[in-house]
């Protein structure tokens, strides 16, 4: 390496090719890297230090140092792993990571970029992307495959279960998993493939509570929440101590002999309020029925609930919820109506007998009530509500009304018509500005991102 002009210009010999840049370019971008250390050295005389690495990949790395971005054609020439290996060698992995991560997810401007297919038993049964670092855990069969922030395969862990229907990251690299065919909530350390322990719901005074299976899992700082369902349909939500894996509290035990008392199939924790939200929906030839319920784990009491059909305004009777989710940041409940397709929202801070405000989109091209297929999955992510209807994927986004400036919500398709023909959407997850979608009886998980070349759009 040669440093000249008062230390401003640097020459590098990489694989026999000479590269020239400014020392400030290297030192300002990655001051603790190998390149920064070499750029401050002046003891090599007039000959640049020879670095025995691929010069073509280094050209990409140098462009990254100069601009903070990867060249547009780099993804088609080099694999992610090749770029990562070189970035780690030069000590600029953090810079490459920032460049490779997708821009903020805008559902109405997202596109399918890849499909992740596990090597064996490729049909996903559960997935989670809640870590926020763009990583993904896929449960398939009795295995869990881990994909890091670059979606590179980091490893697969074989569990003792034949199938996994619930998965949740509870701390570090530890997963809490449940099965629809085996009792108990089980904990695994995925970094080393180590079984940690299990939690079971039992009651010596009630023989009906036996071999309870897990239907849903949610994590919180104070513990893990899991809904359990027994063969006799007795069900409840357990609060589990992370340090001991022992049951800390039994919340909302019920008989499960009607749609209003079935086991919660979805759990969401609201850290700002210290509340737990659960829901269950049953679908039949006459439509949907179910409930949304909010518990305070401190008192173990229900603080609010709604049952559908059977509550709310009469004009909405028969248009029961198809699914619900929670905007954790703004403490807002969202539900999508099974017949009209309208979106209902309720401020958790102002709940009452009928707190729902309904939004419909008058755009005739966005949705028609006569279209076949009802809603099956709803997921909230960064002020956006993603809803699957059959094989189609829609998003409700918050925008400002031009005249009044008040926030309103608009519905748009995320996918194209050809995308919706690939199969019924069964699961939606989002994390790290990526959208993950799986379809019934289809191998793999679709990865959707907003293009880096899309125009900047403000989403409130």
From Swiss-Prot:
Q: Is Aminoacyl-tRNA synthetase set as a keyword in this record?
A: no
Q: What's in the keyword line of the UniProt record?
A: Cytoplasm, Protein transport, Transport, Ubl conjugation pathway
Effect of gene knockout: ABCG36/PEN3 retention and accumulation in the endoplasmic reticulum associated with an increased sensitivity to the root-penetrating pathogenic fungus Fusarium oxysporum.
The record's subcellular location field reads: Cytoplasm, Cytosol
The entry's cellular-component GO terms read:
cytosol
Please quote what the entry notes about the protein's domains: The BTB/POZ domain mediates the interaction with some component of ubiquitin ligase complexes.
Put simply, this protein is called Protein ENDOPLASMIC RETICULUM-ARRESTED PEN3
Q: Which organism is it from?
A: Arabidopsis thaliana (Mouse-ear cress)
Which gene name belongs to this protein? EAP3
């Amino acid at each position: 390496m040669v440093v000249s002009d008062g230390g401003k210009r640097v020459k590098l010999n990489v694989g026999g090719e000479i590269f020239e840049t400014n020392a400030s370019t290297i030192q300002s971008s990655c001051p603790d890297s190998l390149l920064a250390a070499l750029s401050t050295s002046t003891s090599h005389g007039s000959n640049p230090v020879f670095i025995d690495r691929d010069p073509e990949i280094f050209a990409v790395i140098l462009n990254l140092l100069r601009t903070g971005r990867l060249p547009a054609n780099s993804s088609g020439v080099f694999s992610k792993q090749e770029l990562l290996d070189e970035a780690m060698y030069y000590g600029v992995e953090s810079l490459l990571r920032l460049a490779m991560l997708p821009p903020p997810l805008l559902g109405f401007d997202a596109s399918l970029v890849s499909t992740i297919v596990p090597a064996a038993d490729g049909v996903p049964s559960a997935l989670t992307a809640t870590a926020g670092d763009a990583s993904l855990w896929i449960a398939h069969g009795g295995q869990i495959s881990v994909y890091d922030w670059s979606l590179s395969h980091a490893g697969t862990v074989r569990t003792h279960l034949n199938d996994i229907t619930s998965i949740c990251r509870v701390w570090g690299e530890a997963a809490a998993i449940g099965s629809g065919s085996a009792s108990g909530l089980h904990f695994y350390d995925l970094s080393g493939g180590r079984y940690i322990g299990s939690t079971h719901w039992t009651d010596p005074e009630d023989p009906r509570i036996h071999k309870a299976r897990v239907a849903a899992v949610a994590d919180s700082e104070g513990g893990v929440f899991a809904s359990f369902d027994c063969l006799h349909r007795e069900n409840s939500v357990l609060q589990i101590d992370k340090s001991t894996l022992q049951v800390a509290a039994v919340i909302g035990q019920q008989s499960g002999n009607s749609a209003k008392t079935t086991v919660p199939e979805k759990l969401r924790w609201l850290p700002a309020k210290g509340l737990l939200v659960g829901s269950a929906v049953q679908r039949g030839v006459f439509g949907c029925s179910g409930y949304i319920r909010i518990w305070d784990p401190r008192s173990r009491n229900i603080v609010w609930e709604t049952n559908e059909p059977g509550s709310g305004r009469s004009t909405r009777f028969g248009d029961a919820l198809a699914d619900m989710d929670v905007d954790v940041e703004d403490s807002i409940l969202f539900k999508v109506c099974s017949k009209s397709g309208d979106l209902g929202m309720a401020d958790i801070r102002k709940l009452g007998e009928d707190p729902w405000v309904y939004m419909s989109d008058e755009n005739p091209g966005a949705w028609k009530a006569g279209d076949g297929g009802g809603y099956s999955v709803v997921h909230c992510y960064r002020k956006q509500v993603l809803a699957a209807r059959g094989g189609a994927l829609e998003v409700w986004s918050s925008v400002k009304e031009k005249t009044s400036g008040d926030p309103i919500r608009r519905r748009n398709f995320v996918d194209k018509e050809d995308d919706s023909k690939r199969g019924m959407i069964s699961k939606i997850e989002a994390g790290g500005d990526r959208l993950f979608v799986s379809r019934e009886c289809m191998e793999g998980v679709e990865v959707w991102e907003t293009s880096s070349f899309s125009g900047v759009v403000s989403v409130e």
